Design a protein with these regions (language model features):
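A structural signal for leucine-rich repeat
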Residues: 103, 124-128
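Structural signature of tandem-repeat unit edges
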Residues: 1-5, 14-27, 37-50, 60-73, ...
């Protein structure tokens, strides 16, 4: 539990299928899980504040994503080409979703947001994240990981 960062490229092209990040981790760094094409499920704890650029780029089998209630930033291209992603939850703590954070996530159907519709609109999600905009939203959603 002394690990506070999943380092840049830590699991790049690994065959890992499921990831539960440790409870002391605050940062998932660039390319941490790039190309983990067998990865299907990710559980990110409340301690994580930032998911960096390209952190899960090319995780083409990723179906579901649980983001802990402390996540504040999802950086540009963080989940780029996660082409099997069906649903995500977004915590109310979220302040920034970077450009193209969910680019090519064409199967994203559902977004569960912890806050209100007004809180969600205040995020200012841009057209570069149209797959989120196009997905069905559920507001005031209380989830447990």
């Amino acid at each position: 539990d002394s690990v506070v960062t999943v380092g840049s490229g830590a699991f790049v092209f690994s065959t890992v299928r499921r990831v539960t990040v440790g409870n002391n981790v605050v940062l998932i760094d660039m390319y941490a899980f790039q190309g983990c094409d067998k990865l299907r499920y990710v559980n990110i704890p409340d301690s994580v504040k930032r998911i960096s650029y390209y952190a899960f780029y090319g995780c083409t089998s990723l179906k579901s994503l649980y983001l802990g209630k402390g996540v504040e930033t999802i950086s540009d291209y963080a989940f780029y080409q996660c082409s099997q992603l069906n649903y995500i939850n977004l915590p109310k703590s979220l302040k920034t979703i970077g450009d193209f954070a969910f680019k090519d996530c064409y199967k994203l159907l559902y977004v569960y947001y912890e806050g209100s519709e007004a809180d969600y609109e205040a995020l200012g999600i841009t057209g570069t994240n149209h797959v989120i905009s196009d997905a069905k939203k559920f507001y005031n959603y209380n989830y447990e990981g």
